[in-house]
Every structure is written in C-alpha cells, then in structure tokens.
Amino acid sequence: MPNTHTQHVQISEPNPVNTLSTPSKRGHRHRRSLAISGDFDFLKQPAAIVNLPPPQAAENCPSTAPTAVSSTLSPIRYNRFPCKTNEDAGTLDLPEPRFYPLSPKNNLQTPSPRFFISEEPSFSSPVKGVPDAIINLDDALKTRPRSFKSHRRSESAPPDLEVMVDKGNCAAGSNSMIKEEEDSLIEPESKNEYYEQKLPTALLSPLRPSLCVSEQAIDVDDSALNGSPTHHNHGMQNANARNSNTFNSLKIKGQKQRYYHYTKQLPLTVGCDSQSPKEQRSAASMTINQAMTPSSLAYTPSKLASTPATPVSFYDSNADINLESDNFPLKDNPRYAKDGYPKKCGNSQLNRVLDSDKRQDFSGESRRRRSGSPISHMQHRNLIDNMKGRRNSNTINSIFNYKSQHYEMPYDDMMKNENINAQSMPFSVNGVNNENSIGGVITRADDAPLQHSVVKSCTPDGKEEMNRLKSNDSNEYSKSEGQIRTNSQLSKDILMGEPGDMVDLSSFVNAQRKASNETGDLVFSLSQDDDALKTFHASNSAATSNESWCISDDALGKQAQDSEVRRKRKSKLGLFRHIFSRK
C-alpha cells in the first residue's frame, strides 16, 4: 500500500549557467565583501563541472517515486545525479539522494585562493607554518608619503635625533654655553664685568642678567631727584648690583629694587599732594600706600625717615602763623582794604588767607626749596587744614558747605494783574487829572481813592525816568482818555468756575437788545479817540514805548470799594460777558 503521508515535491530545473554564478547578496557583487562573509563561490570553477551532461527529466521517474530534498544547508556544493527507480512496483524503497558532495580528493584541480597577496609568502620564521609579515611596520613609520607635510614642532624633536647630532647641526657652540648659577658665584669680579659688557650671542634661556633690571630701576631722572636726601643711596645700590650674581633666575632682586623705587616716591600722609605734576600718583597707589604693612616696609631702607614722604615737622619756619590763637594779625595790605577784608581774621578765613598769601609771597621760595626741604608747600597747607579740623570738632572738614534756603515769593493776583496792565498799556499820563474831558467822556475821580507811587520806567534807550502814575482799583472798569481802560482781566472765580459774588441774571434779558447798539458806539468811540491820544502823548518817549514796564509798590495796599463801585462793576461785567458770549 503506498504511503499516503509522503509529499510529492516537484523542483524546476535551474539553468546550468546560473548555478555557476553566486546569487547577489546585499545588491552588489564585491569580491572583498563576499570573501569576508565566507562565500567563496566567486572563484572560477573548472571546465569539467561545466561540461557535465544535462540531468534527466522528471517525467522519466515514476509518480510513485517521491523526490526528496536534503534539508541541510551548507556552503558545500553537491553534484546532481539521476535518480534510480525501482523495478518492483509493490515494494517502495527510500529514494537515494540526488545530490552527492564532491570529494576534495577527486581529479578536479582547483586553483588555490590567494587573497590580497601580491607575491608568494616566504617562510623564514623558525616556527613552522608561520609566513613572514606582508607589511613591515618599521618601514611604515619611517616612510613618508608624498602628501605628507611635516610640522615644525615634530621636526624639532625627530625620532632619529642621533643622526642630527652626528652631522653637527647643533646651533649652540662650545663658546656660547650658558653658565650655571653656582659657577658664576665662584668667578671673580673681572669675569662678571666682562659678561656684563658683552652678552653671549647664542640663544639664551629665560634667565635675564640682573644688571639690566637694576640699572633701569635705579637710574631715574637726576634732574627731578637732584638734591633730595635719597640721592646718596644710588652709589650703594649700584655697588650692590655689580657684586651680585650675573644671572638671577627668579629676578627677585630686580623686583625688590623696583618696589623700593616706587615706595620711596609715594607720600605716607593721608591728604598730601604730589610735589610736581610729573610725580603725581593715582588714587589706587595712594590707598595701597596708606595700608602698608610692616612686612612691606621691610624692603625699604633704614633711612626712610628722611624721604620726602615722611611728615618730619608740621610747623614750617618760613610761614609765621600762630595756629593756637583764634585771631592773628595780618599786614595792612591795600588789597585787603579794597576787597573789604577785616584786619582780624578768624579760623573760618584761615584757608583763604593761606591761599592768597602763600601763592604770592612763597611761590618762588617754594620752588627753590622743593628739592631740598623735607616737606612741600602743598603738604604743609593740607596739614594745616587737618589740624584745624581736629581742633574744632564741630567744624566739618569739607569745602562744600551748601545750606538750602527757602525763598517765599508772595503770589498775589492783584500784583500780577497790575504788571499785566502796565505792560499792555504803553502810555501813561503825567500831569493830567482824571477830571479832564477828552472827546466828551468824563471820568469821575471819586470812584476810587487815588494812590500815587514812585515808579522807575525803563526805556529801550537805557534811561531811567521817575513817573507819577495814578493807579486805580484792579477790578474797576473806567473810561479814561476816550477809551475803556481795563485794569484787570476776568476774576479767578469766574474763569475757574468757582462760586463768587451773586450776579443778577435778569439784567441779561434787558441788555440783549441794547448790546448791539452799545457795541457799535463803543467801537466807533475807540477808533475816533485813538488818533487824538497818539498826537497828545507823542512828546513823552518813555511813556509811549511799547517795551516799557512799570511795577507799582503799593499794589498790595488797596482799600475796599464802596457799594456804588460794586454795583457798576456787576452791571458792566454782565455786559462784558454777554458781548463775548455772542461771538
């Protein structure tokens, strides 16, 4: 009975040309990548395998004979042979495999694979089977390709340093060797002077000769320090510099000398000034000098007390000033009499007297004794100021004594209105009473009490004239010289909307019809009387000037108005408001 569990598999015959070629992996056929992955099928196969006879067709085999495929996957290639059929139909034997592996001992000679080898390997090693190295690493380190660019730093210390020494390419000679510090101490003074005069021309180390530093630190401008008590120290410092060693590795000595040169020039007092403009020090140097510690003072010489910075004496013999007395006599100089200075000056005027006297009397003397005296004139003056501040503890040691003062300016509307009226009216009448009639208009003199005041009137010519002006009430509307004279503007209560005096509004109804007629008559009278007033006052230049200004001294002393003036003011004010409201 045939086995029904067996599965018949039909395999299509592949092309024999395609079997010799390796299927593409990763989409390319690169030999090196295939060799690394372990696929060696890219080697050429011998011609015997290609000339094999074609396999038999699958139809020659019976249907009962199933085809078996080996399930093992290996890179070993199998040869294809025709399947063998069994004559007996009743018996079913296991089919023999169609693929048999090729024996490596067969007659097919395959060439030996040689990957990346340009020549045959040589076996010179004592170990059997170990070929010689293909790449010599020693040659790779020393060989430079054409694209290689050497670096200066790498060339300064090449690996084959002995070659350069043998060739004698060293720049330093036997006569240009640097002396050690211990050797220079043993050498005599003559050799030291020789090295100071002539330095070696070869490349020196960071060590510098101490002579250059010491001479730069010591040799200062002799004109500025001539006659000073510290000038005699230069000879001793130069001798010490010559006796010292030639090369100072840390340059400590030069730093000490430079520090000494700086500190001996700085003043030690708090408020002292510099002696000359070229010796001025910054504020930072002054603060560093004030906080000088004993350790920093150890580098200064023992004769520091005689330096210009030392406050030797507060009292100067050339200035005869007694600080203990409150008042001191001064010479009867006509300059003080002219300026109004008293002959007895207190402590408050001490600074001004010192500034004026010592600048004139001691200016030449201070220049002469600036180089030789232990204290300068400017330092002496500052010390006097400090002593005065210490003796009088209540006084403040400051020049800026500003005290705020309150200036109360009286603000009055009457004064302001009077000034405005004086500027707006360029003409003033002198010697003419208010009772005079011009153009048929009469002004009563008893409407307001007359007050005469003396006023200065300034004209553009620069002259001052005395005028008698008759000032009336600031709130009165009076007709003078043929025109309406407004001595004041509208009151502040009306302009600002504040409640003021009671006004009868019924008068506005009756005055509406008369407003147009009165306005026309008013304009006509103003234009008619304007020419007469100009001809009448042509002789008075001070009064007719448009730029003249008058200030009344009695503007604040106004008296109260009577009931008739108030009634007229209310009626005229209502008419004035009605005229402007219609426009």
Swiss-Prot record:
<keyword id="KW-0649">Protein kinase inhibitor</keyword>
<feature type="region of interest" description="Disordered">
    <location>
        <begin position="1"/>
        <end position="31"/>
    </location>
</feature>
<feature type="compositionally biased region" description="Basic and acidic residues">
    <location>
        <begin position="354"/>
        <end position="366"/>
    </location>
</feature>
<feature type="modified residue" description="Phosphoserine">
    <location>
        <position position="398"/>
    </location>
</feature>
<feature type="compositionally biased region" description="Polar residues">
    <location>
        <begin position="1"/>
        <end position="24"/>
    </location>
</feature>
<feature type="modified residue" description="Phosphoserine">
    <location>
        <position position="516"/>
    </location>
</feature>
<feature type="modified residue" description="Phosphoserine">
    <location>
        <position position="552"/>
    </location>
</feature>
<feature type="region of interest" description="Disordered">
    <location>
        <begin position="457"/>
        <end position="486"/>
    </location>
</feature>
<protein>
    <recommendedName>
        <fullName>Laminarase-resistance protein LRE1</fullName>
    </recommendedName>
</protein>
<comment type="function">
    <text>Overexpression affects chitinase expression, cell separation and budding pattern, and increases trehalose accumulation and heat resistance by inhibiting protein kinase CBK1. Overexpression also suppresses temperature-induced hyperosmosensitivity and sensitivity to cell wall degrading enzymes. Overexpression of both LRE1 and PBN1 confers resistance to laminarinase.</text>
</comment>
<feature type="compositionally biased region" description="Basic and acidic residues">
    <location>
        <begin position="332"/>
        <end position="342"/>
    </location>
</feature>
<dbReference type="GO" id="GO:0031505">
    <property type="term" value="P:fungal-type cell wall organization"/>
</dbReference>
<feature type="modified residue" description="Phosphoserine">
    <location>
        <position position="393"/>
    </location>
</feature>
<keyword id="KW-0597">Phosphoprotein</keyword>
<feature type="region of interest" description="Disordered">
    <location>
        <begin position="330"/>
        <end position="380"/>
    </location>
</feature>
<dbReference type="GO" id="GO:0005935">
    <property type="term" value="C:cellular bud neck"/>
</dbReference>
<feature type="compositionally biased region" description="Basic and acidic residues">
    <location>
        <begin position="461"/>
        <end position="479"/>
    </location>
</feature>
<dbReference type="GO" id="GO:0004860">
    <property type="term" value="F:protein kinase inhibitor activity"/>
</dbReference>
